[in-house]
A protein has these predicted regions:
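Asp-based, Mg2+/Mn2+-dependent phosphohydrolase catalytic module
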Residues: 1-3, 101-104, 117-227
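Secondary-structure boundary/capping motif
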Residues: 15-16, 112, 120, 149
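A generic structural signal for short
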Residues: 12-13, 87-88, 110, 142, ...
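Residue-level detector of anion-binding/catalytic polar loops
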Residues: 34, 109, 187
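Conserved SAM-binding loop
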Residues: 13, 92, 110-113, 146, ...
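N-terminal helical cap/lid subdomain that shapes the substrate entry/recognition surface
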Residues: 2-97, 101-106, 119
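Ser/Thr-glycine-rich phosphate-binding loops at phosphate-binding pockets of nucleotides
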Residues: 12, 16, 114, 177
Length: 227
C-alpha cells in the first residue's frame, strides 16, 4: 500500500515549466548561444548545480561588457531569476487539488521534493496560502547534498515519514527527476506535462497527462498491478 507521495514542484504541482523555459532560454541565448537547447539541459537541476556546470568558466563571460567575475555574474542571473519568479503564474496542474485531497483522506503522507530553493517557496506561499495545508513536509535544494538525478532527495523524503522507498510514489515530469525516483526504489509516476508520453515512458512505471479523473484508488490499483 502506498504510504507516502513525494511530489516534484514545477510541472507536477504547478504548471510552470513553460515559463522557466522562457527564462532559461533567454539566459542560454545570452551566455551559451552554442547550446540552442540550453533551457532543456538544465531541467531538474538546482541553481547551484546549473552555475557549477555552466557558469564558472570565464570564457563564457568573455563577451559580457564590464565583466568582473563569475560569482558577480551568477549573482546578476540570480537577481533576474528572483524577479522573474515573483511575477510568475503559479497555476495548479489540472486536477491536482482534488487528487491530493483524496490522498490525504486516505492517510497518505505528502511531501514536496524540489530542486527549487527556499526563496522560491516563499513566493509560492505568498501566492497560495493554502499550499502548506496540502503537504506534511517541503524539501528544497537546501535540504539535500546531491541533486537529481541522484535519489538523495527522494530517499530523504521517505526517511522523513519513516517509510520504505518501495512504499512511496514519486511524481515527476523531468528526465532527471524520473531517474531520481527510479533510483530510489519508489514507484515512478510520470506526468506528461513537460515532455511527451513517449519520451518519459521508459523512465516511468506509469504515465498520466494530469490529475483529472485520477484518484487514490486508481493509483493503488496501478501500483498493485505493477508488482
Amino acid at each position: 500500500m502506498i504510504k507516502a507521495a513525494l511530489f516534484d514542484l514545477d510541472g507536477v504541482v504547478f504548471d510552470t515549466e513553460s515559463q522557466y523555459s522562457i527564462f532559461w532560454g533567454m539566459i542560454g541565448r545570452e551566455y551559451h548561444p552554442e547550446m540552442p537547447d540550453f533551457e532543456y539541459r538544465i531541467k531538474g537541476q538546482t541553481l547551484v548545480q546549473i552555475y557549477d556546470k555552466y557558469f564558472t568558466d570565464e570564457a563564457v563571460f568573455a563577451h559580457i561588457e564590464g565583466f568582473t567575475g563569475a560569482k558577480e555574474e551568477q549573482a546578476k542571473i540570480t537577481a533576474r531569476l528572483d524577479e522573474f519568479e515573483k511575477n510568475m503564474q503559479y497555476e495548479y496542474i489540472a486536477g491536482f487539488e482534488d487528487f491530493i485531497s483524496d490522498l490525504k483522506e486516505h492517510g497518505v503522507k505528502c511531501a514536496v521534493v524540489t530542486s527549487s530553493n527556499i526563496q522560491k517557496m516563499l513566493n509560492v506561499y505568498e501566492r497560495h496560502p493554502e499550499f502548506k495545508a496540502y503537504f506534511d513536509r517541503v524539501l528544497t535544494s537546501e535540504d539535500f547534498a546531491e541533486s537529481k538525478p541522484h535519489p538523495d532527495c527522494y530517499l530523504k523524503g521517505a526517511a522523513y515519514f519513516g517509510v520504505k522507498p518501495e512504499d512511496c510514489v514519486g511524481l515527476e515530469d523531468s528526465f532527471n527527476g524520473l531517474k531520481a525516483v527510479r533510483a530510489s526504489g519508489a514507484f515512478t509516476l510520470g506526468l506528461a506535462t513537460t515532455n511527451s508520453r513517449e519520451a518519459i515512458q521508459p523512465l516511468s512505471d506509469y504515465v498520466i497527462d494530469d490529475y483529472r479523473g485520477f484518484s487514490f484508488a486508481d493509483l493503488q490499483r496501478i501500483v498493485e498491478n505493477a508488482k
